[in-house]
């Protein structure tokens, strides 16, 4: 119920609706979407959360702190989510929506096991949280992940890390040759959102584009990059 109400709050709020990443999160945690997720992972065996999960959210991906928090809640954990100080201002509308829903009396139990914090680069603070957690979720570059993994956790604790990852895209020359200008523009808009909004730093942002020479007109490649340039202008 909490996440479904958060979804509704995000999708009807003008400030969060204007932010594509926040709106996408609101759409992702709709009740129907979560029920489908629960059905996919259904088990006849009883399952419990790990306990206290400490999340280090990345600085380069908007709204990702909300996804990692949501997964932590769905897994049955209490959660401490550290936001980068570089993200706090940009995430203000989504944070405000989250606070409004958490403050509702019916969600007191969720509020009691949810903390969102921010602090500057301070290994001593991070190490203190690591020493107290039952699960650690680390998002960041290889160096950040290695530094955090060197910080001791309780013997029973588990961790999940998301270090540097690289993606590429493969485009069909034949398929791109068949696109109308409108279809090409719509696809370029989506490519721009996936790639340039995060300066190619997201795990799914392609660092390399390969063209499959499967027919069609090679000139479609130039038309494609012109459409992408128009989106970036």
Mark where each language-model region is.
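N-terminal Rossmann-like NAD(P)+-binding subdomain of aldehyde/semialdehyde dehydrogenases
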Residues: 1-51
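Structural signal for hydrophobic packing residues in well-ordered secondary-structure cores
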Residues: 3-14, 102, 106, 152, ...
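Internal helical hairpin/lid segments
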Residues: 217-233
């Amino acid at each position: 119920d909490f996440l479904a109400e958060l979804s509704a709050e995000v999708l009807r709020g003008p400030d969060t609706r204007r932010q594509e990443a926040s709106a996408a999160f609101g759409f992702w945690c709709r009740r129907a979407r979560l029920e489908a997720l629960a059905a996919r992972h259904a088990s006849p065996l009883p399952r419990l959360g790990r306990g206290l999960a400490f999340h280090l959210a990345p600085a380069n991906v908007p709204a990702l702190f909300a996804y990692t928090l949501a997964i932590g809640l769905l897994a049955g954990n209490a959660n401490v989510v550290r936001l980068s100080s570089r993200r706090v201002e940009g995430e203000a509308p989504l944070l405000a929506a989250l606070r409004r829903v958490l403050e509702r009396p019916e969600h007191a139990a969720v509020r009691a096991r949810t903390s969102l914090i921010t602090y500057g680069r301070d290994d001593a603070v991070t190490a203190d949280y690591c020493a107290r957690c039952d699960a650690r979720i680390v998002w960041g570059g290889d160096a950040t992940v290695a530094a955090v993994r060197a910080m001791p956790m309780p013997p029973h604790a588990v961790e999940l890390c998301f270090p540097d990852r690289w993606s590429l895209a493969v485009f069909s020359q034949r398929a791109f040759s068949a696109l109308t200008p409108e279809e090409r523009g719509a696809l370029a808009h989506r490519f721009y959102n996936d790639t340039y909004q995060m300066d190619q730093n997201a795990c799914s942002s392609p660092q390399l584009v390969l063209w499959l020479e499967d027919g069609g007109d090679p000139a479609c490649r130039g038309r494609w990059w012109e459409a992408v340039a128009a989106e970036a202008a």
